[in-house]
Amino acid sequence: MNAVTYEHIKTCKQSGARLGIVHTPHGSFETPMFMPVGTQATVKTMSPEELKAMNAKIILSNTYHLWLRPGNDVIREAGGLHKFMNWDGPILTDSGGFQVFSLSDMRKIEEEGVHFRHHLNGSKLFLSPHKAMHIQNDLGSDIMMAFDECPPMPATYEYVKASIERTSRWAERCLEAHQRPEDQALFGIIQGGEYEDLRTQSAKDLVSMDFPGYAIGGLSVGEPKPIMYRMLEHTTPLMPFNKPRYLMGVGSPDALIEGAIRGIDMFDCVLPTRIARNGTCMTSKGRVVVKNAKYERDFTPLDEKCECYTCKNYTKAYLRHLIKADETFGIRLTTIHNLHFLLNLMEQVREAIRNDRLLDFKEEFFEEYGLNVENPKNF
């Protein structure tokens, strides 16, 4: 029995969107679901109680950062990541691969793993499939990710071909090194850049290894969104229907809706918390940058439709004042709002799937949000 299982409830008659439930050792969550990112074992400025109050069911933490500080051995001795950070719901940890390939300029890829330099102090480090599994087993997350190479985009066909072949070999080593399959589910990551045949090959390789779930990696790395959507349309049908499907690194409202339409169950991104820190807020009518001078005397909430703590209690003028004054409370309030907005959006997406009207919802949302879509009923 896998530690994590997927229960399919229904498919939207308007699209390929799925309503489902993912069951984990620390509880279940409905999908499609957005996962707030807690890079350093905390979702920045947020308490676990606040996250639960806004219906965040699962959060993501970062293997690379927790390995370097405080160390996976410290977290193991604390009783695992759940106890360490006082979060009793499901946790997903990434493998650290994306950070190795995105944060470190000095790296050397070998068959056994990657040599690179610490992004803060320059010390030499080595991360391999075996090491990534050891760290994540110490962390004790419910869902852990295979160690993969995330090729840049654009990259040549030859480079990406060699990369996915290496990722497949690394995936096999991850399965061999995984010590806790009974209470931690290991997901494989499909790569392939913008090349459909390489996405097909990567998917076939990984599906043959029978992981409990699958992610699509290497998208949302700067490519135009039409390319991302084309890769999703090609790749998602290659993934097992009875297992969770996870699109890594996606968190803009339009991409969440488009991903759900194409059959994705799980999403994560630092976007809502990162932009909150400079005063950028997502609302039903588009983004609001509260630092702008036009909000100095705007005594209305960020979003009249929003039921979050921030919108029920504070105005754009007050938020502008806090952000301009570099007050931590301002960052907390904008973070609360952005996370609530995306989690509530996913609740609306699930309800639209339940009622077989996700494309209708997309049209309504895009029009109000101010997204220019020529034919929103197409996908």
Swiss-Prot record:
Gene3D superfamilies to which the protein is assigned, alphabetical: Queuine tRNA-ribosyltransferase-like
Keywords on record: Glycosyltransferase, Metal-binding, Queuosine biosynthesis, Transferase, tRNA processing, Zinc
List of residues binding Zn(2+): C306, C308, C311, H337
Ranges annotated as spanning the membrane: none
Domain of life: Bacteria
GO cellular component: cytosol
Cofactor(s) in the UniProt record: Zn(2+)
Region (RNA binding): 249-255, 273-277
Binding site for substrate: D94, S95, G96, G97, F98, D148, Q191, G218
Pfam family, one: TGT
Family: Belongs to the queuine tRNA-ribosyltransferase family.
Function summary: Catalyzes the base-exchange of a guanine (G) residue with the queuine precursor 7-aminomethyl-7-deazaguanine (PreQ1) at position 34 (anticodon wobble position) in tRNAs with GU(N) anticodons (tRNA-Asp, -Asn, -His and -Tyr). Catalysis occurs through a double-displacement mechanism. The nucleophile active site attacks the C1' of nucleotide 34 to detach the guanine base from the RNA, forming a covalent enzyme-RNA intermediate. The proton acceptor active site deprotonates the incoming PreQ1, allowing a nucleophilic attack on the C1' of the ribose to form the product.
Binding partners and assembly: Homodimer. Within each dimer, one monomer is responsible for RNA recognition and catalysis, while the other monomer binds to the replacement base PreQ1.
Name of the protein described by the UniProt record: Queuine tRNA-ribosyltransferase
Species whose genome carries this gene: Macrococcus caseolyticus (strain JCSC5402) (Macrococcoides caseolyticum)
Gene: tgt
